[in-house]
Amino acid sequence: MAKLHDYYKDEVVQKLMTQFGYNSVMQVPRVEKITLNMGVGEAIADKKLLDNAAADLAAISGQKPLITKARKSVAGFKIRQGYPIGCKVTLRGERMWEFLERLISIAVPRIRDFRGLSAKSFDGRGNYSMGVREQIIFPEIDYDKVDRVRGLDITITTTAKSDDEGRALLAAFNFPFRK
């Protein structure tokens, strides 16, 4: 079991119960899932780019990504409905906790010119989204084998009812928010 999950059960739950005055342990917000998304718009011209992006995402997450297709045709972007234009992975359970642990302790500190994550990236319902400009911050990606530096979107979905609850949950995990 991931250390972060044990830490959540042993300490974070108690801390949040006293902070927000919950009556039941089930009211305490928890991390539900983490979604990693990589949009590869250049895949229209070269299909190999999408395969490489999917391989990077598989290495980062530990599971095979789903290839996302265009929902509708857009002439300005030269895409048709059904064209593969990206890939995504949804992490739950054990893999989710392991990824969150790696993200907080290893990947985020390796971001260039890092001054903390924005605390304003909550969606109003306690879910946090962030963008990473380079996939090479993850230790699973071999820098020498990277064909192109790509970014990815990371969305942490929680059961929190408000942004304050979500922020408190992630702050309890020592999420490096900007002061």
Curated annotation (Swiss-Prot):
Q: Enumerate the Gene3D superfamilies for this protein.
A: 3.30.1440.10
Q: Name one Pfam family in it.
A: Ribosomal_L5
Give any GO molecular function from the UniProt entry. Answer: rRNA binding
Report the GO terms under cellular component: ribonucleoprotein complex; ribosome
- Protein's job: This is one of the proteins that bind and probably mediate the attachment of the 5S RNA into the large ribosomal subunit, where it forms part of the central protuberance. In the 70S ribosome it contacts protein S13 of the 30S subunit (bridge B1b), connecting the 2 subunits; this bridge is implicated in subunit movement. Contacts the P site tRNA; the 5S rRNA and some of its associated proteins might help stabilize positioning of ribosome-bound tRNAs.
Q: Which PANTHER family match?
A: 60S RIBOSOMAL PROTEIN L11-RELATED
Q: What family does the Swiss-Prot or TrEMBL record give for this protein?
A: Belongs to the universal ribosomal protein uL5 family.
Name of the protein this chain belongs to: Large ribosomal subunit protein uL5
Per the UniProt record, the source organism is: Photorhabdus laumondii subsp. laumondii (strain DSM 15139 / CIP 105565 / TT01)
